[in-house]
Structure formats: structure tokens, C-alpha cells
């Protein structure tokens, strides 16, 4: 789920796509159409409770002592 957006049923998603396509056929840019439909959806669902689930790895909850490194595959330059 995108922050601030309610979870939508498949039918609601399909309706949103059709609304975006309708706005675009009237000459609106895709970005503007998406933003407008998102605002309409937020307005319709204002005050609704949205269930949020966070997926956390149990083994990394208290790993603040561990160091993490990123290997980009590049050789490091020696100075």
C-alpha cells in the first residue's frame, strides 16, 4: 500500500484505471490524471480505517551492533 492511500478492491482499482484513461483522453497528462484520481479516492475514503502490516525480519530487530556493508562489485582504489 502506498502511504496515505486506502487499500482498494480489484473493482475499485479497475474503476480508477478507467477514470485515469478517461481524463487522459480529454487531454490531461498521465501524471495529472493519476494525481486527480488519487485525490478523489482519498476524498471518498476519508476517515476510513486502513490496515497496515509491516514485514520485519525477526532476526534483525536488535542488530544495531552489527555493521552492514554494500558491495557494488567495484574494486576499491588504494591510496
Swiss-Prot record:
TM ranges: none
Q: Known InterPro entries for this protein?
A: UPF0181 (IPR005371)
Q: Locate the region Disordered.
A: 54-79
Give the family this protein belongs to, as stated in its UniProt record: Belongs to the UPF0181 family.
- Its recorded name reads UPF0181 protein PC1_1931
The organism is Pectobacterium carotovorum subsp. carotovorum (strain PC1)
